Regions:
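Mid-core helix/loop region of P-loop NTP-binding domains shared across ATPases and GTPases
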Residues: 135-168
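Phosphate/oxyanion-binding active-site loops and adjacent basic polyanion-contact surfaces
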Residues: 34-35, 117, 121, 125, ...
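Generic structural signal of hydrophobic/aromatic residues within well-ordered alpha-helices
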Residues: 26, 71, 125, 129, ...
């Protein structure tokens, strides 16, 4: 239980702290002061032992999505560094300086991809991919990309007359 992030006062703004059941947003858990078991050491372990592919296997409801969202919250350009104040990873000053808020992060979850048939599931998947490409559309202006890569990226965000992503 020593990893449980506790505040001095169990009551915040007159309300008791709650368990974050079903919440997979790291930012929401921290900002709304839900109980949180500090798993930020995972960030340190992952960045020190980086593999070409990292596989995270756990049964359903074991925090995979929350951990991936925590990692995104740490690495993504423009992240709110204060979210990690007081958490274990914040003690790793060099690691935070090198990695925190330094990367564009493509984050895809297939939780909401659904359909009653192949075409509707495909359309739902295309929408999920297109929305993530649109969220990171500033990447299409990166000086690190060739013109061809920029054009390919921009094509991912084109929508048709029905509001569907055309080129995903």
């Amino acid at each position: 239980l020593q990893n449980l992030v506790m505040k001095e006062d169990e009551k915040i703004c007159g309300t008791e702290r709650k368990l974050p059941i079903g919440i997979d947003s790291f930012e929401k858990i921290i900002r709304h002061n839900f109980y949180y078991v500090d798993k930020t050491e995972m960030i340190t372990e992952l960045l020190h032992n980086w593999g070409e592919v990292n596989l995270f296997t756990r049964p359903r409801r074991f925090g995979k999505s929350l951990n991936m969202n925590m990692l995104q919250s740490f690495l993504e350009i423009g992240c709110d560094k204060s979210l990690f104040n007081g958490l274990k990873v914040s003690r790793e000053k060099e690691l935070c300086e090198e990695y925190m808020g330094k990367f564009p992060v493509i984050s895809l979850t297939l939780k909401n991809v659904e359909g009653l048939n192949f075409e509707s599931a495909r359309k739902s998947l295309k929408n999920t991919l297109g929305m993530e490409a649109w969220r990171l559309s500033a990447l299409a202006e990166s000086s690190r990309l060739t013109e061809e890569e920029k054009n390919s990226y921009k094509a991912l965000t084109v929508v048709d007359d029905h509001g569907d992503f055309k080129n995903v």
